[in-house]
């Protein structure tokens, strides 16, 4: 009797284990992996289910879905001329991935630029100035950076308006945020040859939700997107383009 009970208990445990690893849960036919959500397969299903979760298409999509570079300079230039329409297509592709609607206002006011350096793949950006009010002295800006793309190093100096002070928050992806203020940070990403030398040697990785501010008025700074691209909000004093100074004197906005 005892022997039969032990055999039944063992068989029951085996069946429960098999059910768990084949993904049968209280949610119906969904697998453990799909029910658990992104990045939690093995924790929810147990180590024996690792292969099951790795082979599950939904789980693999959730774990691996990251935006990556799709366009290069071969797409962005034709006979040496910057193709703004292609650059906009690239930006819209990134927006679609991140679930950012392309609004009528964006269609009207959004711009893309290679800053005249002929290397949009690596040095360039898209953006919208939501507001730039000289009377009340405030500015709101969306920064769009494709994977690996950098804004040329620059500073904002005083004109008839005060020197621009600014803050940034990452909405999607992440960026290297560089400043000339602070000690040199090791293991910096390579700066594109088309940009040339930089003054800003201190940087931090700025992730989604992180808010950083310009460390000092009129100091040089720039940001570079990571391999997933980035969408960044900027808030600042009034932006006077006459006060914009690039390290690379060939660059212009």
What kind of feature is each model-predicted range?
Residues 1-10:
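Bacterial N-terminal signal peptides that target proteins for export
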Residues 21-24:
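N-terminal Sec signal peptide cleavage junction
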Residues 31-63:
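Secreted, short cysteine-rich peptides and small extracellular cysteine-rich domains stabilized by multiple disulfide
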Residues 64-139, 193-194:
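A short, N-terminal "cap"/entry segment at the start of jelly-roll beta-barrel domains
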Residues 130-140, 153-166, 219:
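A short beta-loop-beta micro-motif enriched in histidine and acidic residues
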Residues 146-147, 163-185:
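Glycine- and acidic-residue-biased ligand/ion/polar-headgroup-sensing regions
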Residues 152-154, 160, 177-178, 213-214, ...:
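Short beta-strand His + acidic residue motifs that chelate non-heme Fe in jelly-roll/DSBH
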Residues 182-199, 220-253:
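Double-stranded beta-helix
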């Amino acid at each position: 009797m005892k022997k039969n009970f032990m055999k039944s208990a063992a068989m029951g445990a085996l069946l429960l284990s098999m059910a768990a690893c084949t993904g049968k849960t209280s949610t119906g036919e969904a697998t453990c992996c799909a029910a658990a959500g992104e990045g939690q397969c093995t924790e929810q299903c147990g180590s024996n289910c690792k292969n099951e979760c790795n082979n599950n298409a939904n789980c693999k999509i959730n774990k691996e879905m990251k935006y990556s570079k799709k366009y290069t300079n071969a797409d962005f230039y034709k006979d040496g001329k910057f193709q703004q329409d292609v650059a906009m297509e690239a930006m819209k592709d990134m927006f679609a991935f991140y679930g950012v609607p392309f609004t009528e206002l964006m269609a009207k006011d959004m711009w893309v630029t290679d800053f005249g350096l002929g290397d949009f793949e690596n040095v360039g950006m898209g953006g919208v100035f939501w507001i730039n009010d000289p009377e009340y002295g405030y500015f709101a800006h969306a920064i769009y950076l494709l994977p690996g793309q950098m804004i040329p190093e620059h500073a904002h100096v005083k004109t008839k308006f005060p020197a621009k002070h600014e803050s940034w928050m990452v909405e999607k992806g992440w960026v290297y945020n560089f400043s000339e203020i602070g000690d040199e940070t090791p293991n910096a990403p390579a700066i594109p040859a088309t940009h040339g030398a930089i003054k800003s040697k201190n940087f931090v990785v700025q992730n989604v939700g992180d808010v950083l501010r310009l460390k000092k008025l009129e100091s040089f700074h720039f940001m570079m997107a990571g391999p997933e691209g980035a969408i960044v909000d900027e808030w600042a004093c009034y932006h006077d383009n006459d006060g914009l100074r690039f390290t690379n004197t060939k660059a212009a906005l």
